[in-house]
Amino acid sequence: MIKTSWEGNCFLNFFNNKASIGNVDKTIFKSKSTSPYKLLKSTHDEEGRCILPVLHTAGGLVGGDLLQFEVNLEKNSKVLLTTSSAQKVYGSVGRSKINPKGSFSKQKNYIKILDNSHLEYLPQETIIFANGLYDQKFKVFISENSSFLFTDLIRLGRSSSGESIESGVFRSKLEIIRNNDLYDDWEYVDQIELSKASYEAKSGMDYMPVFGSLIWVCEKDFSKLKINNLVGNIKKFFKESDNHLSIGILENGISVRFLGSSSQEARKCFFCIWKQIRSVCGFCEPKYQGVWPLQDSMNY
């Protein structure tokens, strides 16, 4: 039987290279991947942080596709992972007489962050085309003195073409587990399902097609005062925005939600929050990445 779906794998192992840039240690990596994954050229910022864009060469996902993405940060690593384009999930429902209900395309993500390491995973948005079915799972293990920043931006349908999600479904589960010497402690769990019903519900998305999450889990001993000041600054920024934004304080970090009509506005909001997080951590100011949409760069 001829297979018509992708089964792609990507493994990335980042580690600190003592051969430094001046007086700054540089994070480098080893990788192993299969199609449709392709790694673009990595660069480094002034803190030695490895900046790596990942490309999905197939141009999108269809029902039955299975991707596995595994990331490991060794001790004393700093990494910014992103993607070079939006992830497109094409329609599956009603496309096949054999399986008229369609089948989900799936992505499983496994991330491990060891001592004194910091991962920023900022992929571009996922676009669920009409009748697209997508299920993503993230399992993140993080040490007590490390941090993890993650953004997830979802667009339901191509609203510029008058398209909605129709019978499509987006599912996501994020689990963040804190490692210590004695036991593993659940840090954060987030489970989301978006469909036409939630898109149309007044108490849901209320016909606004763009939904975003920003999750930042910091070191266990990070200053609570700094987190409170960060939240205060972000709330001031919210007052200047016409979008629906909310923020919650986690035990160690923050959770931000975005709801609106513009992916560009969502990216702008998350970029501004990212700058605030970098500042409160004492890291260098982030820069707009060249693989991100050109029109956005004029606004930052």
Curated annotation (Swiss-Prot):
Name any GO cellular component annotation: cytoplasm
Q: Where in the cell is it found?
A: Cytoplasm
Q: Describe the family membership recorded for this protein in Swiss-Prot or TrEMBL.
A: Belongs to the UreD family.
Protein's name in the database: Urease accessory protein UreD
Source species, domain of life: Bacteria
Q: Which organism is it from?
A: Prochlorococcus marinus (strain MIT 9312)
- Its job: Required for maturation of urease via the functional incorporation of the urease nickel metallocenter.
Per UniProt, what is the name of the gene that codes for the protein in this document? ureD
Main location (coarse class): cytoplasm
**Could you cite one Gene Ontology molecular function of this protein?**
nickel cation binding
The record, for InterPro entries, names:
UreD
Subunit comment: UreD, UreF and UreG form a complex that acts as a GTP-hydrolysis-dependent molecular chaperone, activating the urease apoprotein by helping to assemble the nickel containing metallocenter of UreC. The UreE protein probably delivers the nickel.
In this record, what's one Pfam family? UreD
UniProt keyword terms in alphabetical order: Chaperone, Cytoplasm, Nickel insertion
